[in-house]
Structure formats: structure tokens, C-alpha cells
């Protein structure tokens, strides 16, 4: 079953093009994206790999990153493509 996570991401532009995506709270989350319009899909795949890693190693996933069931608002920043 899918869960909703709140995870800060750092997008670092690369000289050769594209971006490296990491998270300061999940050091295992490292991926690259060529086109920022694909970031949701790419990060979702990387996040699924991190979740699987935690399960396989028996490491407990940080509960503070799970957004479901919270009674308070979730701060959400996003990149939005708009205009022409």
C-alpha cells in the first residue's frame, strides 16, 4: 500500500546537464533527473528503492517523514511549470 511522505529534496544542477536529487533527511535517497518535468516519477522510484532497502536491512524508517494520519498541515514546496 502506498503512503504519503514529506521529504525535503535538494536539486543540484550538473555541469553536463540535468540535476542530482538528494535529501538531507534520507542519505540513501540519491538519484538524477534530466528533465525536471519527470521529477515526481524519478523521485518516487528512488523513494521506493529506499523503502525496500530499509525493509531488507530491518532498519526502521523515520516515522516523522510519514505524512499520513497527521492532524496538522503539511508544508509543501514544489516546482511548478507555468507560462509559455
Question: Where are the model-predicted features located?
Answer:
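Short, charged, surface-exposed hinge/linker loops at domain edges
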Residues: 1-7, 41-84
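Proline-rich low-complexity regions
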Residues: 24-27, 62
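Residue-identity detector for glutamine
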Residues: 14, 37-38, 70
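Intrinsically disordered/low-complexity terminal segments and short unstructured peptides
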Residues: 19-21, 30, 56
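Short aromatic-glycine-(Arg/Gly/Cys) micro-motifs in beta-strand/loop hairpins
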Residues: 11-25
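A short, exposed loop/beta-hairpin motif centered on an aromatic-Gly-Thr core
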Residues: 27-38
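Short, positively charged
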Residues: 2, 9, 13-15, 33
